[in-house]
């Protein structure tokens, strides 16, 4: 409980009250210059009996042998406990060239117990267009492990059915980009905001000597997310132009007043501009505890009876004392958090209070629950 109070207070106090200068490269990206997702299906071999015997794994195994010129009789059922069917995925960076290597992630798609010690055989990685952009192969690095006893007991640490192969795929072809096309480039903000888009365009025009008053502009905001920038046609000059442009510093607009709640972990992040309207709050907690004890009833030694097991249930209800808080106009959520923490409230209590304040219209800010 005390840890929650300290961590939440730190989150609240460290949030800046004013925006600060940032580089363009840290707040925006170039439209069309991005990574691409690749995916493939393959087989991992060499497992120490931790593979699987599923139908699709057997079918894949037969297909692999057929490609190597080996045919199995249809009635022959191979024992392949050292083989596992896997899905392979990777991100192909922008401008990746043939011959370069990328990291890949390998995940079991069947009932394999572990991929520890396995080797991925040649697997084609395809893009959304169905074309092969990389080929993967290599020995897996698996951080997790598992063990199983003869009675069915089992222990698993981390995730032994997922592994990685650093530099495990070789790029076969590049993905075309529109970087060198046209007379303009478009910068897309990571967090769309009209004020930030205008400030970004004004900074570029000022630093590059544009004269908006005479109708000569280099950067022009398109909407809340994008700024169009005139750029040289020559590829070499365009690279140098962007190298200079992306290091310009400007001051983005203040972030919107927002409260973000992760209901699964109890994490609460509060923006510094969030305010409360006058409100009175009361919140009480009802705790119900149910415990069960097994009791054995034993008959007398010479009595004609049987031993019986009965269950005794104990239900305990604890209604915590509730307190009312009254806040004046303009109170920050930091003050609300401190008031709630003083009575030892749990993260769930604060979540309920914040949601109730939003429904009452007293929370001046966006409430986001993830």
Swiss-Prot record:
Q: Which Pfam families does its entry note?
A: FlgI
Localization, UniProt: Periplasm; Bacterial flagellum basal body
Q: What is one Gene Ontology biological process annotated in the Swiss-Prot or TrEMBL record?
A: bacterial-type flagellum-dependent cell motility
What the entry lists under InterPro entries is as follows: Flag_FlgI
For this protein, what is any one GO molecular function term? structural molecule activity
What is the protein's major site of localization?
periplasm
Instruction: Give the signal sequence positions.
Output: 1-21
Q: Which residues form each disulfide bond in the chain? A: none
Give the superkingdom in one word: Bacteria
The answer on whether this UniProt entry bears the keyword Signal reads yes
Which keywords does UniProt give here?
Answer: Bacterial flagellum, Periplasm, Signal
- One GO cellular component from the entry? bacterial-type flagellum basal body, distal rod, P ring
Query: What's this protein's function?
Result: Assembles around the rod to form the L-ring and probably protects the motor/basal body from shearing forces during rotation.
The record's comment on protein family reads: Belongs to the FlgI family.
Complexes and interactors: The basal body constitutes a major portion of the flagellar organelle and consists of four rings (L,P,S, and M) mounted on a central rod.
HAMAP family (alphabetical): FlgI
Query: Can you say what this protein is called?
Result: Flagellar P-ring protein
Question: Where is the organism placed in the taxonomic lineage, from the top?
Answer: Bacteria, Pseudomonadati, Pseudomonadota, Gammaproteobacteria, Alteromonadales
Gene name of the encoded protein: flgI
């Amino acid at each position: 409980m005390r840890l929650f109070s300290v961590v939440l207070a730190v989150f609240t106090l460290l949030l800046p009250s004013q925006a600060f200068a940032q580089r363009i490269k840290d707040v925006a990206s170039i439209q069309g210059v991005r990574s691409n997702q690749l995916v493939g299906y393959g087989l991992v071999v060499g497992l120490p009996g931790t593979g699987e015997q599923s139908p699709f794994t057997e079918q894949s195994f037969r297909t692999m042998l057929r490609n190597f010129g080996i045919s199995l009789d249809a009635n022959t059922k191979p024992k392949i406990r050292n083989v596992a069917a896997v899905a392979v995925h990777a991100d192909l960076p922008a401008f990746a060239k043939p011959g370069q290597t990328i990291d890949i992630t390998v995940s079991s798609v069947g009932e394999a117990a572990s991929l520890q010690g396995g080797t991925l055989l040649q697997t084609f990685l395809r893009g959304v267009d169905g074309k092969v952009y990389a080929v993967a192969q290599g020995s897996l690095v698996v951080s997790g492990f598992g063990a199983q006893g003869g009675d069915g007991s089992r222990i698993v640490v981390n995730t032994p059915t997922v592994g990685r192969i650093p530099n495990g795929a070789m790029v076969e072809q590049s993905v075309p980009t529109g970087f060198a096309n046209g007379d303009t480039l478009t910068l897309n903000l990571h967090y769309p905001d009209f004020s930030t888009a205008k400030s970004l365009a004004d900074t570029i025009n000022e630093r590059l000597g544009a004269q908006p008053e005479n109708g000569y502009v280099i950067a022009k905001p398109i909407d809340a997310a994008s700024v169009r920038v005139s750029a040289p046609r020559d590829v070499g000059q365009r690279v140098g132009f962007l190298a200079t442009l992306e290091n310009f510093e400007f001051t983005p607009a203040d972030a919107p007043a927002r409260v973000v709640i992760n209901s699964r972990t109890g994490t609460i992040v509060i923006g510094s501009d969030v305010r409360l309207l006058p409100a009175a709050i009361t919140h009480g907690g009802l705790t119900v505890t149910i415990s069960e004890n097994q009791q054995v009833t034993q008959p007398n030694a010479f009595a004609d009876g049987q031993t019986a097991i009965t269950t005794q249930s104990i239900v305990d209800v604890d209604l915590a004392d509730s307190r009312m808080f009254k806040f004046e106009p303009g109170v920050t959520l930091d003050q609300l958090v401190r008031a709630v923490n003083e009575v030892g409230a749990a993260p769930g209590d604060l979540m309920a209070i914040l949601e109730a304040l939003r429904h009452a219209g007293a929370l001046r800010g966006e409430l986001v629950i993830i």
